[in-house]
């Protein structure tokens, strides 16, 4: 007995695994941002912008639909619809700001309807 240990089988298996080519060799995974990164980037983008975020024609249809409940065949100046849209978006932005403050106060991140 020389005292030398017999080679272990799992070492041979490990070496064989290293030399074998992986199934997806040469295929690079597409780049993905971590969860929340894109959301934060969008928040910064929309906070900087001053343009209207709701499309004009769908908003105009909504205004006409609501107005038709009170009186049919009403006509609107384009500036009147624009003023309504500015007011509606300003109200919604304020509402979301307050909602976010409430979520932070409640130690929450997500807001839900």
Curated annotation (Swiss-Prot):
CDD domains: HFD_H3
Superkingdom field: Eukaryota
UniProt cross-references to SMART domains, sorted A to Z: H3 (SM00428)
Species in which this protein is naturally found: Stylonychia lemnae
Region described as Disordered: 1-31
Stored SUPFAM superfamilies: Histone-fold
Biological function: Core component of nucleosome. Nucleosomes wrap and compact DNA into chromatin, limiting DNA accessibility to the cellular machineries which require DNA as a template. Histones thereby play a central role in transcription regulation, DNA repair, DNA replication and chromosomal stability. DNA accessibility is regulated via a complex set of post-translational modifications of histones, also called histone code, and nucleosome remodeling.
PANTHER family in alphabetical order: HISTONE H3
Compartments where located: Nucleus; Chromosome
Main location: nucleus
Disulfide pattern: none
Recorded GO MF terms: DNA binding; protein heterodimerization activity; structural constituent of chromatin
Subunit record text: The nucleosome is a histone octamer containing two molecules each of H2A, H2B, H3 and H4 assembled in one H3-H4 heterotetramer and two H2A-H2B heterodimers. The octamer wraps approximately 147 bp of DNA.
UniProt-listed InterPro entries: Histone-fold, Histone_H2A/H2B/H3, Histone_H3/CENP-A
One term under GO cellular component: nucleus
Keyword field contains DNA-binding: yes
Extent of Basic residues compositional bias: 1-17
The protein, known as: Histone H3-8
Record family assignment: Belongs to the histone H3 family.
Keyword terms, alphabetized: Chromosome, DNA-binding, Nucleosome core, Nucleus
